From Swiss-Prot:
Gene3D superfamilies: Acetylglutamate kinase-like. It comes from Psychrobacter sp. (strain PRwf-1). Keywords: Amino-acid biosynthesis, Arginine biosynthesis, ATP-binding, Cytoplasm, Kinase, Nucleotide-binding, Transferase. HAMAP family: ArgB (MF_00082). This is Acetylglutamate kinase. GO terms for molecular function: acetylglutamate kinase activity; ATP binding. It is found in: Cytoplasm. InterPro entries: AceGlu_kinase-like_sf, AcgluKinase_fam, ArgB, Asp/Glu/Uridylate_kinase, Glu/AcGlu_kinase, NAGK-C. The keyword ATP-binding applies. Pathway: Amino-acid biosynthesis; L-arginine biosynthesis; N(2)-acetyl-L-ornithine from L-glutamate: step 2/4. Belongs to the acetylglutamate kinase family. ArgB subfamily. Pfam families: AA_kinase.
Amino acid sequence: MSLNLAQAKTTAEVLTTALPYIQRFEDKIIVVKYGGNAMTDPELESSFARDVVLLKTVGLHPVVVHGGGPQVDNLLKELGRQSDRIDGMRVTNKSTMDVVEMVLGGSVNKSIVSLINKHGGRAIGLTGKDANLIRAKKLLMSTTDANGQTSDIDLGFVGEVVSVNKDVIMMLIGSNFIPVIAPIGVDSEGNSYNINADLVAGKVAEFLQAEKLMLLTNIKGVMDKSGNVVTGLTPKKVDEMIEDGTISGGMIPKIQCALDAVRGGVKSAVIVDGRVPNATLLEIFTNEGVGTLISRDLGAALS
C-alpha cells in the first residue's frame, strides 16, 4: 500500500510520538484483562489482537487474562440450565463448573489464541490448572440481614486466587510467546474454581510485578460527581471517592482490584474503555489514554 506525502507525514508523526513510550516500556510486562464489548464485536476483537501483537513486536511483554461470562450464559441457556447470581457472582455447582471450564478454557481461550496468531503473534492458551498456574481456594461470602444476623453464602465452585506460578509465565515470555490465561483456578485437591477475571488479572500482575495492569471495560472510566471521566487517581484519592460515594455499585470491585494490584507493587493500573478501537495502544503510547489511571506516583505514570 502506497501513501501520499500527507499520509506519510501523518504516519511519521504518529511513530515519532510513540517512540518515547516504546523505549520506556521496552522489556516491561503489561497484563491486560480482556472482556466486555471488545470480546463480542468482530472489529474490536481484531483491533485487540493486532494491538497485542504490536506490543510484543516493539519489545513489550503482554500477558492476556480473559473473561467470558456472556459466552457461558449462552451455552447454559442452550443446555436448558439455570444459572443464579448473588451480588454479581455466578453460583457454580459441579455441572455448571464443567460448562464454565469448557467455555472459558476451551472455545473462548482458543478463539483468542487463534486470532492473535492470525495477526502474526505467538499466543499460547492456558488455564490456571496448567502447571498449577493459579492456585485457588473456595471464595467465602456472607450476608447480614436487617436484624444484624450474619449467614454464609455458598457460591459453590467460585474461588479466589491464593498464588500464581509466575515461573510458567516467565518461561513463556522468555520463549517469545504471548500467554493467554483463562480465569480458572485449582486447589490442592484438584478441584476447579471459577474466578472473576478482573481478580485473576490483578493477581497475575501482582505476582509478576508488572509495569501496568489494564482492565478493559464497557465504561469510559471512573466518573466524578459531575459525570466527567477522572483521568488519574492515587490510592488515597480512590479511598476517598469510595467513602464519599462517588465510586459505588459495580465499579467498586473493579476499582478495588486495580487498587490492590497497585498496593501490591504493580506500577500502575488503568481502567480502559474497551469499546474504543486500539484502546490498548492509545493507553500505552499516548498521553491522553482512554480511561482512568491509578498509581502511587501519578506524576511519573502520566508523564
